[in-house]
Amino acid sequence: MNSIEFPLVDRTTQNSVISTTSNDLSNWSRLSSLWPLLYGTSCCFIEFASLIGSRFDFDRYGLVPRSSPRQADLILTAGTVTMKMAPSLVRLYEQMPEPKYVIAMGACTITGGMFSTDSYSTVRGVDKLIPVDVYLPGCPPKPEAVIDAITKLRKKVSREIYEDRILYQQENRCFTTNHKFHVGHSTLTGNYDQGLLYQS
């Protein structure tokens, strides 16, 4: 046998030998065991709960919900993320082992939703805190859309090269800042300004 060339496979062992790369083998094993950490804060998470039932059966994708971030490799964020909860979400993400993935589920998670215009305590998009792999719009998204997002994430995982992902994560790290709110003195006295009532 020539050590420089690949060994020839005869007809008897041809059906029992699989040739692959270590990267493809790693991607295949991760496809079969995406373990999500569920981070739900409002109504989108209730819609996600229907996936656990027999109708949608998300166990067929190898999804086993975990309660510890150290055992999870996927975090599903659903619902409004407030400034008070933002450090907890970042801490959960940082405790997850590499490679880790994020699915942002629902309008409130992606853009802040209806709370983004007049609420000072809402994070206007979870991608300002952690890197997001798949965006899932809707208010709330249907379970079929969640299955589609998981399928798209599985396609992304199957095509990625591990070394490229590590370099990408080192270049595009998300850093958070401490938000400081300045409380001003109230100008409200409890009385109506009669001049404002009769202006035309």
Swiss-Prot record:
In short, the EC number is 7.1.1.-
Self-association state and partner proteins as the record states: NDH is composed of at least 16 different subunits, 5 of which are encoded in the nucleus.
What HAMAP family does the record point to?
Answer: NDH1_NuoB
Q: Using the UniProt record, give the first listed, main subcellular location.
A: plastid
Example of a GO biological process term:
photosynthesis, light reaction
What protein am I looking at?
A: NAD(P)H-quinone oxidoreductase subunit K, chloroplastic
The cofactor named in the record is: [4Fe-4S] cluster
Q: Which UniProt keywords apply?
A: 4Fe-4S, Chloroplast, Iron, Iron-sulfur, Membrane, Metal-binding, NAD, NADP, Plastid, Plastoquinone, Quinone, Thylakoid, Translocase, Transport
Co-factor note (free text):
Binds 1 [4Fe-4S] cluster.
Task: Name the source organism.
Answer: Buxus microphylla (Littleleaf boxwood)
* Record membrane topology: Peripheral membrane protein
Q: Which SUPFAM superfamilies match?
A: HydA/Nqo6-like
A molecular function (GO) term = iron ion binding
Q: Name one GO cellular component term.
A: chloroplast thylakoid membrane
Q: Which PANTHER family match?
A: NADH DEHYDROGENASE (PTHR11995), NADH DEHYDROGENASE [UBIQUINONE] IRON-SULFUR PROTEIN 7, MITOCHONDRIAL (PTHR11995:SF14)
Q: Which residues hold [4Fe-4S] cluster? A: C43, C44, C108, C139
Relate the protein's function as given in its record.
NDH shuttles electrons from NAD(P)H:plastoquinone, via FMN and iron-sulfur (Fe-S) centers, to quinones in the photosynthetic chain and possibly in a chloroplast respiratory chain. The immediate electron acceptor for the enzyme in this species is believed to be plastoquinone. Couples the redox reaction to proton translocation, and thus conserves the redox energy in a proton gradient.
Taxonomic classification, please? Eukaryota, Viridiplantae, Streptophyta, Embryophyta, Tracheophyta
The record's subcellular locations are: Plastid, Chloroplast thylakoid membrane
- Could you tell me the gene encoding this protein? ndhK
EC main group: translocase
Show the catalytic activity. Answer: a plastoquinone + NADH + (n+1) H(+)(in) = a plastoquinol + NAD(+) + n H(+)(out); a plastoquinone + NADPH + (n+1) H(+)(in) = a plastoquinol + NADP(+) + n H(+)(out)
Similarity section = Belongs to the complex I 20 kDa subunit family.
